[in-house]
Amino acid sequence: VDISFFMDRELFDREYQKLFRETPLVACLSTDLPEPCTFHAYDDLDIPIVVIRGKDGQVRAFLNICPHRGARVVRTESGKASRFTCRFHGWTFDTTGKAIGIPEEAQFCGQIDDRKQLVPCPAEERHGLVFVQAAPNSVMDLDTHLGQFGAELDRLGLAQAVRVKDDEVSVRSNWKYTI
């Protein structure tokens, strides 16, 4: 194998975009979001994402970035909350990502109308897992992605799985080396 297969930055960037941004990845177990208003935040792929089970029981994912000034909205890995407030200027969002509180909103003179929502990412709950695609404006086709593997996932009974331990291993290498 040619060494450029592992060292070419342009190739790496294309692979990273395709594999880790435009592909559905497991964000968490369904049991990590056991009831309405529970959330799980992560930024394993250098994009901060928060997955929220809404008051309606629906799972949604958003960039964990305040649309006002780009600060993190959710600062803890997991928990329960019916609203999320950015520490920077106090913008507050509900479990659907909609802004429900913007301090001194009138002073913006309507210039923030397009920023009154957290940026959504495609998310879907299946087989006891929550899948998220880290490309906000993309379309996630989970059935095509999983194919026949979906039936295999069902047989694992992951809907009842409980997280026992979290371990993180950080390796500075091309993703192909770690596989």
What are the functions of these language-model segments?
Residues T38-R87:
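Glycine-rich active-site/cofactor-binding loop and its immediate structural neighborhood
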Residues V1-V59, T92-I179:
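Rieske [2Fe-2S] iron-sulfur-binding subdomain
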